[in-house]
Regions:
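C-terminal nucleotide
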Residues: 2-4, 13, 42, 51-64, ...
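FAD-binding core of FAD-dependent oxidoreductases
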Residues: 19-30, 64-79, 206-207
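Anion-binding (especially nucleotide phosphate/pyrophosphate-binding) glycine-rich loop
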Residues: 1-52, 56, 191
Length: 241
């Protein structure tokens, strides 16, 4: 691959809250990759881009992470991700999987809440689980397999617009995660606060942001009020294709 020898500099700004599991660091790398592609006039197949970004984070920055955040940032919108080894492919030294775009109009009303002051870096959240998984701990291995099953069921619930089922799966996701992680009390409090309003709740990623389904504007207002009382900010994310 031949690149021209013109110089460049990179400057960036972001409004993504830091260290609350909303993938702010990888979003900067994805944006930088897009700039470099345009600057050098090169193309990287879309399915390979998340793996390229992840390799920069793991190999150059030493960050423990997975492909999920990078996939949705590269594809945008809503994407079903299948990480089964049966669909694993390798091209140009990059391992990637099966990613399916879904229509964002299938989504029910969702909220996103994050803590305004407390946070935890993604690598802190993931490092212990990675070593336990690699060591073959059955509790962790079984939980990871269950997460995959929940994803398949979540896709089916979206396609059939079964929002009650989707809400139940969201709650089951968090309950499964709680069974293998030692979570800070303030993160548990965020989830339990949303659930007391009648909404579903799970982590949006790692480190202090949650996402879930709400049923009415009155419920959303209650979520906002109760989240504010524990130092958290709530928004309605806009998901476009």
């Amino acid at each position: 691959l031949r690149l021209h020898d013109r110089n460049f500099s990179v400057r960036y700004e972001t409004n993504i809250p830091r260290q609350v599991g909303l993938a702010g660091s990888s979003s900067i790398i994805v944006a930088t990759l897009r700039c470099l592609k345009k600057f050098y006039g090169i193309d990287i197949p879309l399915a390979q881009q998340p793996s390229f970004v992840l390799s920069a984070e793991t190999e150059e920055l030493g960050i423990s992470a997975g492909l999920q955040d990078r996939v949705i940032q590269c594809y945008e919108g809503m994407v079903y991700m299948d990480f089964d080894r049966l669909v694993e492919r390798v091209a140009d030294g990059l391992t990637f999987y099966a990613y399916e775009r879904l229509d964002p109009d299938l989504l029910p009303p969702i909220y996103l809440a994050y803590h305004d002051e407390l946070s935890e870096p993604t690598e802190t959240f993931h490092n212990d689980i990675r070593s336990r998984y690699d060591g073959g701990e059955s509790l962790v291995v079984n939980a990871m397999q269950h997460f995959g099953q929940l994803t398949v069921q979540g896709r089916e619930a979206l396609l059939s617009r079964d929002w009650g089922r989707l809400s139940a799966l969201i709650d089951e996701n968090f309950d499964t995660r709680r069974s293998i992680y030692k979570l800070p009390s303030w993160q548990i409090n965020m989830v339990e606060t949303a659930r007391r309003c009648g909404a579903s709740a799970k982590f949006a990623g790692s480190g202090g942001a949650i996402v879930g389904v709400y049923r009415s504007e009155a419920m959303f207002r209650e979520i906002c009020d109760r989240m504010a009382a524990i130092g958290s900010h709530t928004i309605k994310p806009v998901v476009t294709g």
